[in-house]
């Protein structure tokens, strides 16, 4: 009897633990209602899920909603749920259904209903938001029925799609996603670092551009005449993709999506020999040549036509409807100036640099960031041979594959044409494209939120304030740096919490006068940050109308359950 009672009590003790262990995967959905209409729940159903959606999401509010699949059945489970909202008061019937699916992979989807459509998403569209365990996916709908709504899943070529609205605006007046340490989507050479504590992106630059990034943080390092990207603290860290690979990614994107403005922001340059944190003028020239002769759509400027501050000129200065893309390279103020005029890119076959047999061949698929011993790429990973006597500073040759798609199409036209012009490649000193803002240097998401919102308020009192760069990244905790067996403590793992704070908190700081121009993040793995920022292109929202008319308009409100 005593043994039976003991077994019974033991069973009661273990059952709750078992339930906790077998609890299913969950996450968060951020619903941002940036329309003048309340969203009213008219239908909901769930099977084996936590799925408690609010009856109403008022106009101009946001709602963070938790959801959870009860059972982890892998890619073929039958847990699922739906919640349908209608836009109350919309002149044309409009609704959407939030769907949770498990079969063929867990994901959250948005199914448009009635006559609802948005920029790039026609009536009846199905938008896949994806899913990240304990992370956040975003659905935003902005605007009203008098024009096109702006929503999740924006067009890949979003600048061309919104050019009628943003063309007359300057870089100070629009918003763009920015890739933090964009070249660190793989580790090619290791110097005491591994992917867990040096890799900041899970997809390469091409895919980051597809997902909407237009400002790329590129950190060049030269080793024996070859250019890489880096994530280093002193001499500790790792090299990422080569500059040649990044050039190929950009050329591929601009060929497929003409008319987009891309800024490469060169920072944290390094000379691997003796770990010098500055480049020599000769090395800068090598890098300039590699970029200028490699990039198909390198923008050129007429110094006589433009002001010193390029952040104040209209976007249509750089790209126009149907034009080719424009790639600008922003360099530190201490970098030497490029030569005043440039050679014709259309060189003969004998004049072109030869192929680089060491060019990387990494794919554009998401990489396994959790393997400490597997590094994509074909370079030596332990830094061996770096300290050999090798003073070969021969400039890196440009692979034929970079220039294979080069065209001789007309460069974007510049305003106020003159009879005599001197064009120079757009290597722009930082002071000519000034930015404000700084990263928070914290491993605490709440501090990150407060710090970035404070800086947003401080640096953006008006739409004509300098470009504000809002950096939503988590600094890896010291104890997490060697914890390579735990993906959640990696740099990309930390991005989950940073993204959640961004999606839930940024609305508190937004108005028609106060908004970030750049949102810089780790792990741009989908287009949801682009969707968030594309709401800036909506004209005549209720908030803007109220502010222009001098009437009261409440701040965006949270309606968390």
List where the protein language model places each region:
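Intrinsically disordered, low-complexity acidic segments that are enriched in bulky aromatics
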Residues: 233-299, 303, 323
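Active-site-proximal loop/turn and secondary-structure-junction residues that shape catalytic pockets
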Residues: 222, 268-270, 333
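Long, acidic (Asp/Glu-rich), low-complexity accessory segments flanking structured domains
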Residues: 24-211, 224-256, 261, 276, ...
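Long, low-complexity intrinsically disordered regions of secretory-pathway proteins
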Residues: 359-410, 558-561
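Surface-exposed substrate-engagement region within the catalytic domains
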Residues: 300-357, 368, 411-511
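Conserved, mostly hydrophobic/aromatic
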Residues: 219, 264, 519
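Fungal secretory targeting signals
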Residues: 1-23
């Amino acid at each position: 009897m005593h043994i039976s009672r003991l077994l019974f009590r033991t069973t009661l003790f273990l059952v709750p633990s078992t339930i906790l262990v077998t609890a299913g995967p969950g996450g968060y959905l951020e619903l941002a209602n940036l329309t003048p209409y309340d969203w009213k729940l008219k239908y909901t159903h769930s099977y084996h899920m936590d799925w408690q959606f609010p009856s109403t999401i008022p106009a101009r509010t946001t709602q963070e909603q938790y959801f959870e699949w009860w059972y982890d059945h892998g890619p073929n489970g039958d847990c699922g749920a739906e919640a349908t909202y209608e836009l109350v008061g919309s002149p044309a019937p409009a609704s959407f259904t939030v769907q949770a699916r498990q079969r063929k992979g867990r994901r959250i989807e948005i199914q448009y209903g009635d006559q609802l459509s948005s920029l790039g998403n026609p009536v009846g569209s199905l938008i896949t938001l994806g899913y990240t365990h304990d992370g956040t996916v975003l659905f935003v709908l902005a605007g009203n029925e008098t024009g096109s709504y702006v929503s999740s899943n924006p067009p890949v070529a979003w600048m061309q799609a919104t050019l009628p609205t943003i063309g007359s605006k300057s870089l100070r007046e629009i918003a763009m996603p920015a890739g933090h340490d964009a070249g660190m989507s793989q580790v090619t050479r290791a110097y005491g670092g591994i992917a867990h504590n040096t890799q900041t992106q899970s997809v390469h630059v091409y895919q980051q551009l597809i997902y909407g990034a237009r400002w790329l943080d590129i950190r060049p390092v030269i080793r024996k005449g070859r250019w890489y990207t880096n994530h280093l603290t002193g001499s500790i860290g790792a090299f990422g993709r080569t500059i040649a690979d990044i050039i190929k990614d950009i050329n591929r994107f601009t060929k497929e999506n003409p008319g987009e403005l891309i800024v490469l922001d060169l920072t944290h340059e390094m000379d691997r020999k003796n770990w010098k944190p500055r480049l020599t003028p000769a090395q800068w020239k090598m890098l300039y040549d590699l970029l200028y002769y490699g990039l198909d759509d390198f923008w050129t400027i007429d110094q006589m036509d433009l002001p010193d501050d390029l952040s104040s000129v209209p976007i249509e200065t750089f790209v126009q409807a149907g034009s080719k893309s424009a790639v600008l390279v922003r360099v530190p103020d201490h970098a030497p100036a490029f030569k005043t005029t440039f050679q014709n890119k259309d060189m003969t076959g004998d004049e072109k640099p030869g192929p680089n047999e060491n060019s990387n061949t990494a794919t554009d698929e998401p990489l396994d960031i959790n393997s400490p011993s597997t590094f994509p790429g074909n370079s030596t990973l332990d830094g061996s041979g770096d300290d050999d006597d090798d003073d070969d500073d021969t400039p890196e040759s440009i692979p034929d594959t970079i220039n294979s798609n080069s065209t001789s199409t007309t460069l974007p036209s510049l305003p106020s044409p003159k009879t005599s012009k001197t064009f120079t490649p757009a290597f722009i000193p930082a002071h000519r494209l000034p930015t404000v803002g700084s990263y928070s240097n914290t491993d605490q998401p709440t501090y990150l939120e407060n710090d970035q919102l404070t800086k947003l308020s401080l640096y953006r009192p008006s739409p004509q304030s300098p470009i504000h760069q809002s950096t939503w990244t988590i600094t890896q905790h010291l104890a997490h740096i060697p914890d390579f067996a735990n993906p959640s403590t990696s740099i990309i793992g930390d991005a989950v919490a940073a993204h959640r704070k961004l999606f839930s908190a940024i609305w508190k700081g937004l108005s028609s006068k106060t908004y970030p121009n750049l949102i810089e993040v780790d792990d741009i793995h989908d287009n949801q940050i682009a969707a968030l920022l594309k709401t800036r292109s909506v004209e005549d929202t209720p908030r803007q109308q109220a502010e222009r008319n001098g009437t009261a308009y409440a701040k965006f409100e949270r309606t968390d359950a």
